[in-house]
């Protein structure tokens, strides 16, 4: 079970959550020892807490989750971590979304947010300590009740047992007594050999809610007296309203308001369809601004010009230019990828209710405190007066780290004095995104007389994601060269540099961020190096990764499981790629069939070996890898955002297609055993998909794919 909390104030948070179920509360700070305790109505609200465990007198255990659930099963995974150390009955566990508060700030981002495969990694230690603290307090409560030493008691599946006397007590019966005890400053954590929850394939806690329809997504929110809004936005990036005539829109039956907001003109109506009809009737003249001449062609030209010049040096080992000059053989290549939209299944939406002293926001957000700050600014209130109610997310992929849809809803609600839901159409969503940056990469490599690489030069030009958040030091954005600046291959001379190229198209975080395009660049070109040196692509990688044991292990596992080197059926071909990013290691082998006469490609199988530390829930991890394959194949085979006259040309899934069910290959997932802390898997398993696929196409056709998405001529 999962529900939302309706407030920010910690004391109110506790009272609301514990209504009718007094018991043991344990909270803890991310960076400090365990601290503070709240016991229902009678306890004191803890300060700067990061997450919570509540053991109710009814034996229910509630884990409060400060992360966003967008399909990755984080509700279940984080609950498993706390429940393991608590030693509770898993069937008695439920979860609740925590409110927005600085106490929950993700140390990676500086905001409360979910992304970069950080949710499990940053919660692993705090949640284990919270669960263990609650367990120790329950043991102490039982020991005091029975007049025995705590060391004689043990916890098991929601019960404390005293073996010598056979006495037993449920957690619920001990909760109130435990709540009166101090939180221990140091708690013993389980030996992983004792784990009975973590590491076991576990069904998702939110599946029943999604099956019966009770899971609330942002698009499902309803509030008393709520109106519905659609926003007309300038089709050209950077444009704004010059003037508008609202007469025809206001004449549409059911339209209540037509108002200008910072991002365009809002039509407010009795329902979303009527608001859309009102937008169709609205007459707007746009000031199209400075980007009206931008096109995909001009952007590509800009990138090529920038990449031809030296830029900020992101990595330098040895003297790559001199080594290239003395190499026995030289190869060069240029790679290019387009802008990409996020295309979340649930389009952007937000419901807001602004009053004189309070603002409530219901949003499918990945960044609660950013949404809170944006809403506070738009409402003219302090952040403490803004209450963020996080819903389930119908996909995130980084898009919902933005707060543009929150600002719109708050501005409209403030203007009309009523709660309002803003809904984006699919066309709005595709044409007003913060896109994965288009990128351009030049490569040069030098080989010795035996065909091994001795020089590697990589120049990248693309927009900066981080530039809109503040000035770039030395005009450098590390996300733009992500993984290219940390190339794992043992090559003695390496030079990687970067040039910012800003064509005026808004860019943002997209699943795996810079690694998404740079994985394609790097792993495609290393395949070219193997071919030029007359090496097997797998064997070349093996030798160059000899000093990187975790990376080498996933490479060897993927190759072995895929049968690398074994004969394939006629017309079948393989490609391989391996990437490390977001603290994870992954290798993939893609098997395809190609009909060169018809220029048709079928992806048959993807074999994936990954090392992400300890696997908390292997079944969810496998699902994450499968979804990464879908996302990676969609980007490689189908997707491109193209620009003409400063406008996005794509409108819906008819011209921005995604992978269909019948196109989905078999995906074999092999999780490497590990005793290391978990990292997460939502990001790093995306980047190898495209290069492994394109390397398989080269094996089939002898043609290199250096530009995505793949075209029919690449299969000839």
Please report, for each region that a protein language model flagged, where it lies by residue.
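Cofactor-binding beta-sheet edge motifs in enzyme active sites
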Residues: 2-30, 37-716
């Amino acid at each position: 079970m999962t529900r939302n909390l309706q407030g920010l104030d910690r004391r109110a948070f506790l009272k609301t959550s514990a209504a009718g179920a007094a018991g043991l509360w344990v909270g803890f700070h991310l960076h400090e020892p365990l601290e503070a305790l709240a016991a229902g109505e009678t306890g004191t609200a803890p300060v700067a807490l990061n997450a919570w465990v509540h053991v109710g007198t009814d034996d229910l255990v509630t884990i409060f989750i400060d992360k966003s659930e967008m399909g990755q099963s984080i509700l279940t995974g984080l609950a498993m971590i706390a429940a393991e150390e608590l030693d509770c009955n898993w069937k008695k566990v439920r979860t609740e979304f925590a409110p927005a508060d600085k106490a929950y700030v993700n140390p990676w981002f500086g905001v409360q947010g979910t992304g970069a495969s950080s949710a499990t990694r940053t919660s692993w230690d705090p949640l284990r300590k919270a669960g263990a603290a609650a367990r120790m307090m329950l043991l102490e409560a039982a020991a005091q009740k029975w007049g025995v030493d705590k060391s004689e008691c043990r916890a098991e599946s929601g019960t404390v047992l005293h073996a010598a006397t056979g006495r037993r007590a449920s957690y619920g019966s001990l909760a109130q007594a435990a709540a009166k005890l101090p939180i221990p400053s140091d708690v013993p954590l389980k030996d992983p050999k004792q784990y009975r929850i973590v590491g076991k394939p576990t069904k998702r806690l939110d599946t029943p809610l999604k099956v019966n329809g009770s899971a609330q997504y942002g698009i499902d929110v309803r509030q008393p007296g709520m109106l519905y809004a659609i926003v007309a936005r300038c089709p050209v990036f950077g444009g704004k309203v010059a003037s508008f005539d609202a007469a025809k829109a206001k004449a549409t039956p059911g339209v209540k308001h037509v108002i200008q907001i910072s991002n365009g003109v809002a039509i407010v109506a009795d329902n979303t369809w009527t608001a859309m009809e009102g937008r169709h009737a609205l007459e707007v003249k746009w000031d199209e601004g400075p980007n009206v001449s931008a096109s995909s062609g001009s952007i590509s030209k800009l990138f090529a010009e920038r990449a031809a010049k030296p830029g900020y040096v992101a990595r330098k080992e040895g003297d790559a230019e001199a080594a290239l000059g003395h190499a026995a053989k030289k190869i060069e290549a240029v790679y290019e990828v387009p802008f990409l939209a996020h295309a979340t299944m649930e389009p952007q939406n937000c419901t807001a209710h602004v009053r004189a002293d309070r603002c409530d926001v219901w949003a499918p957000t990945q960044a609660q405190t950013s949404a809170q700050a944006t809403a506070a600014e738009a409402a003219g209130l302090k952040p403490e007066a803004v209450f963020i109610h996080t819903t389930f997310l119908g996909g995130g992929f980084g898009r919902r780290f933005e707060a543009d849809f929150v600002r719109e809803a708050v501005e409209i609600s403030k203007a009309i004095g009523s709660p309002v839901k803003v809904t984006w159409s699919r066309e709005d969503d595709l044409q007003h995104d913060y896109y994965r940056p288009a990128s351009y990469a030049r490569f040069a490599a030098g080989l010795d007389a035996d065909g091994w690489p001795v020089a590697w030069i990589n120049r990248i030009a693309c927009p900066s994601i981080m530039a809109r958040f503040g000035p770039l030091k030395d005009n450098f954005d590390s996300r733009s060269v992500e993984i290219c600046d940390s190339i794992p291959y043992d090559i003695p001379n390496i030079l990687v540099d970067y040039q910012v190229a800003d064509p005026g198209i808004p860019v943002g975080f997209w699943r795996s961020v810079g690694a998404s395009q740079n994985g394609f660049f790097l792993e495609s070109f290393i395949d070219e190096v193997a071919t030029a040196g007359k090496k097997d692509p797998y064997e070349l990688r093996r030798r160059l990764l000899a000093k990187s044991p975790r990376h080498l292990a996933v490479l060897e596992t993927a190759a072995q499981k895929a049968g690398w080197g074994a004969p394939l059926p006629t017309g079948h071909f393989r490609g391989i790629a391996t990437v490390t990013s977001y603290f994870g290691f992954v290798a993939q082998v893609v098997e395809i069939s190609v009909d060169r006469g018809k220029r048709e490609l079928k992806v048959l199988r993807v074999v994936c070996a990954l090392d992400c530390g300890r696997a908390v829930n292997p079944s969810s991890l496998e699902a994450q890898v499968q979804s990464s394959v879908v996302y990676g194949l969609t980007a490689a085979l189908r997707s491109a955002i193209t620009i003409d006259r400063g406008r996005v040309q794509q409108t819906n899934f008819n011209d921005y297609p995604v992978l269909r069910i019948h196109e989905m290959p078999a995906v074999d997932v092999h999780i490497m055993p590990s005793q290391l802390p978990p990292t997460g898997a939502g990001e790093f398993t995306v980047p190898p998909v495209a290069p492994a696929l394109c390397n398989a196409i080269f094996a089939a056709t002898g043609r290199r794919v250096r530009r995505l998405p793949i075209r029919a001529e690449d299969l000839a």
